[in-house]
Amino acid sequence: MILAGVIALLVVLLIARAVHTLYSVSSYRKSWQTEAKSPIKKDVLVVAALGDSTVQGVGALTRSGSFINQVTARVSDSLDKDIQVYNFSVSGAESGEAADVQLPQLKGLERVDAVVIAVGPNDLVHQKSLSSFLKSYETILKNVPRDKTVIADLPPMGPKDPQGRDSYLWGQELRKLAKKYDVRVAPIYENIKPRAHDFRTYGGDFFHPSTTGYSLWANAFEKPLTDILKK
């Protein structure tokens, strides 16, 4: 009887986590979109973000748990400068959408001090080719301020694929492209892989990172973003 109650409670908790993750897709999007309409404040560092649901922070318990919020808070503290984020990412976005839709929004900003990009897992999930992914990404890199840009390589794709075989290979090819255009790379794969088997790294859908998982993303982005913004 007690065991059945415990199992039932666990099921309820898992369902609640999954529902929260689904809800966060729309709630985080609306929040970021509202902030993206705000004028740039005086005496702030401006960080623009492009990408998919990981850039939105889907999976985190609150939006403040997103890696963008976590890493900009850290860098803001270390540099003693306020940071204003313009997050143009879209949940479910592939690299092509980042190039065609999000990039023009970035170029509409009157100024930007750093650009953060994380996109690619949806290309894999939707079975797009590596060549089309790299072509879209190259379009992005040709049109961003390269000395102000840091991109993520691809993470292992959830606890069902802790080795992240395809994401590793795609990430290696992306690194070659980043080297060609002389942009910084945040080592997401390297930071996530040791914890890829740990379900606590993932949110309620066991695919997107949790707040804890996003702290690992923030670890990967912290140094390159700091290096860009302290110039």
Where are these regions (language model features)?
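N-terminal secretory targeting modules
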Residues: 1-49, 61, 76, 197, ...
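Short amphipathic alpha-helices and their capping/turn segments at secondary-structure boundaries
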Residues: 30-43, 100-109, 138-143
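Conserved SGNH/GDSL esterase-like catalytic core that processes O-acyl groups on lipids
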Residues: 46-48, 56-135
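Conserved beta-strand segments of alpha/beta enzyme cores
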Residues: 84-86, 148, 182-184
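Residue-level recognition of beta-strand->loop/alpha-helix junctions
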Residues: 87-89, 153, 187-189
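Active-site segments of SGNH/GDSL-like serine hydrolases
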Residues: 116-122, 140-169, 190, 196
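Alpha-helical scaffolding segments of alpha/beta enzyme cores, especially the outer helices
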Residues: 132-135, 139-142, 169-176
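Catalytic His-Asp segment of secreted/periplasmic serine-dependent ester chemistry enzymes
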Residues: 160-231
